[in-house]
Each structure stands twice: as C-alpha cells, then as structure tokens.
Amino acid sequence: NIGGSGEVSTAGGNISVGKISGNAELSTAGGNINLDGASGKIEANTDGGNINLKNISGSIEANTAGGNIDAELIPTANSNSEFNTASGDITLKISSDAKVSIEATVYVGKNMSESEADKLIKSDFEAANVDFNKNNFIKKFVLNGGGSKVELNTASGKIKINKK
C-alpha cells in the first residue's frame, strides 16, 4: 500500500500494489503490473506485460506494448483515463450507473470490412456513435449523460466493455 505519492519501477519483474491513495508512476520493462485500488492520478507502463487494475476511482493512464489490459473503474468527476496497447486486448468493467463517456478505438487494416471490425469491440452498453474509416474503427458510449472520459486504444487486439 502507498499512502501518498510514489514511483515504482523494475527492469523485468512484476509490480503488485495493494492500494494507492496519492499519485503514482508504475513502470516495468518486461513484467506485469497489478494494482488493487487507487484514488489518485496513476501512470502504469510496461513494455511486455499485462496490466491488471481493480477498484480505480482516480485518473489512470495505462500503456503496454505487448500485453493485455484489464481495468475495473469506479469513475468520479474529472477522473479521465486512457488505456493503450499495441498488440493486446483491453477489458473494461464499469458500473451501469457510472457517468462516463467512453471512446473505444481499434486500428484496422485497409482490407477489413466494417462488419469484421465490429466484432473487435464488444460492449454490454449501446453505442452512441460508430465511426469506421480506412485506419480506425471507433465506438463511442455515453453512460448516464456522460462525464469523465475513458479512452481505450488497441492496434491489433480486441476491446470488451462489461457491466460490473
């Protein structure tokens, strides 16, 4: 547990933190990042591992080059978050009563049809807007009038948005 602000980094190992109530930066070159509770501003970066986040009520930016991201959010006012993976999947779990605006983007190849791209973003919520062009397939979701912004981006993976 980290009661204030902190920085944790490792060259190749895993990082597991119980709870962070302040701001923190977590980074590893090749391991996984596990965080079970945060209310501050968090940055989590790994080059080759997975990122697992639970009970996150603060802002978070999570980036992985070669892993998956699993995030369970409890969004509060102005707790904007961004999740990016180059070649992994993103799973977001969020309460159906959350006030949040979600933008899910999958980068697609020129030869992919819209119906094929549609299979890459699955959600328990109804999309408010869908945009498909030669590079991107984007679904936007506005829950309960919108609020904090959540961005989900993957270059070659799938995105799932589930009710918690």
List the predicted regions and their residue ranges:
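Intrinsically disordered, low-complexity terminal regions
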Residues: 1-164
